[in-house]
Amino acid sequence: MFMPKAHRVAIYEYLFKEGVIVAKKDFHAQKHPELESIPNLHVIKAMQSLHSRGLVKEQFAWRHYYWYLTNEGIEELRSYLHLPPEIVPSTLKRPARSETVRPRPAVGGPRGPGDASKTGEDRSAYRRAPGGSGVDKKGDVGPGAGEVEFRGGFGRGSRN
């Protein structure tokens, strides 16, 4: 497809600067959202050309194209745009880590300081005592020891 060289160079510069470019699958859009002076069709066709040469990887989801530069694409665009090797796409740059100090949680256990009022005594009230309930669990074990109770579980309502 014929397109002005200025459009192609602007698309390649943006792609090299960002490392990725996104375009909606709308061939009739008057302009691309990031590149206001360039039609969306020119962006799609330029990226399809790079994809056919193996310089970008293409993903398509939800009516949007996503193109990512490959290592070969970085070298090719660097030579096409006459850029020095020190300049790299922003996807390859490591984010600057700020040395911010995170507040440490207060010592009070894994649940935080709000649960410090709950002690083992509060929790022990919910636990069963080893012999305090009056039920002999060991004596009820065996065939025929338990009572069989039939209750209706299926059907249309309860019949008494």
UniProtKB/Swiss-Prot annotation:
Organism (species): Drosophila melanogaster
CC terms in the record's Gene Ontology section: cytosolic ribosome; cytosolic small ribosomal subunit; nucleus
Transmembrane portions of the chain: none
Name this protein carries in UniProt: Small ribosomal subunit protein eS10B
Coiled-coil region: none
Record's subcellular location: Cytoplasm
Keywords: Cytoplasm, Ribonucleoprotein, Ribosomal protein
Top-level taxon of the source organism: Eukaryota
Entry-linked InterPro entries: Plectin_eS10_N, Ribosomal_eS10, WH-like_DNA-bd_sf
Region of interest called Disordered, as start-end residue ranges on this chain: 88-160
A molecular-function term among this protein's GO annotations: structural constituent of ribosome
PANTHER family named among the record's database cross-references: 40S RIBOSOMAL PROTEIN S10, RIBOSOMAL PROTEIN S10
